[in-house]
Swiss-Prot record:
Active site: S108 (phosphoserine intermediate)
Residue ranges the record marks as coiled coil: none
Record region (Disordered): 1-22
Protein name: Adenylyl-sulfate kinase
Gene: cysC
Organism, scientific name: Staphylococcus epidermidis (strain ATCC 35984 / DSM 28319 / BCRC 17069 / CCUG 31568 / BM 3577 / RP62A)
Family: Belongs to the APS kinase family.
Keywords, sorted A to Z: ATP-binding, Kinase, Nucleotide-binding, Phosphoprotein, Transferase
Primary enzyme class: transferase
GO biological process assignments: hydrogen sulfide biosynthetic process; sulfate assimilation
Alphabetical list of Pfam families matching this protein: APS_kinase
Protein's pathway: Sulfur metabolism; hydrogen sulfide biosynthesis; sulfite from sulfate: step 2/3
Record function comment: Catalyzes the synthesis of activated sulfate.
UniProt-annotated binding residues for ATP: G34, L35, S36, G37, S38, G39, K40, S41
Length: 199
């Protein structure tokens, strides 16, 4: 894929700060990362609903959903996984510029890729949420039957089984989805957002 040298960035006359002021809250990416089955999608759905009910401008980007459209041409090789996250990072940045609290739920197994998204954003605009859950518990849950398929060899390069997952070392938030309820996890994240004056 060739890159064009003949493109120009066109600034909007409406700034991010103006959008945030109108919304009554800051914008940021709330980036859920964790193994398949750890609760990323479940908790992120509940968080988005809670933020929406509180009158916040919010939108959720989910790993499976994005692969139905924007990233449907990508597989699960290390290179494709990285490109998947790079594209999502660019979309998330646009949504932050639009003033939204952008909730994302992606396995995003590689630390370098997550840090690449962080680097796209301004300071304090990337909130990493680690959905901590043992692979044993995730496999026990197996809501999509993916671990079973991975064990049988039907799914190669499956994170946590036949492909690596690099857990965050210093996430802004860690939720223990093996022991805490969905409601407890959402309360923990909302508390963080309020304490750090995002909302």
């Amino acid at each position: 894929m060739s890159e064009s040298n003949h493109i120009t960035w066109h600034d909007s006359e409406v700034t991010k700060k103006q959008r945030q002021h109108k919304n009554g809250h800051k914008s940021a990416v709330i980036w859920f990362t964790g193994l398949s089955g750890s609760g990323k999608s479940t908790v992120s759905v509940a968080l988005e609903k809670e933020l929406f009910n509180e009158g916040k401008q919010t939108y959720r980007l989910d790993g499976d959903n994005v692969r139905h459209g924007l990233n449907k041409n990508l597989g699960f090789s290390p290179e494709d996984r990285s490109e998947n996250i790079r594209r999502i990072g660019e979309v998330a940045k646009l949504m932050v510029d639009a003033g939204a609290l952008t909730v994302t739920a992606f396995i995003s197994p590689y630390k370098e890729d997550r840090e690449g998204v962080r680097a796209l954003l301004e300071d304090n605009e990337f909130i990493e949420v680690y959905t901590k859950c043992s692979v044993e518990e995730c496999e026990k849950r197996d809501p999509k039957g993916l671990y079973k398929k991975a064990r049988s060899g039907e799914i190669p390069e499956f994170t946590g089984i036949s492909a690596p997952y690099q857990a965050p070392e210093n996430p802004e938030i860690t939720i223990d989805t093996e022991h805490d309820t969905i409601e407890q996890s959402v309360v923990q994240i909302i508390r963080y957002l309020k304490e750090h004056e995002y909302i």
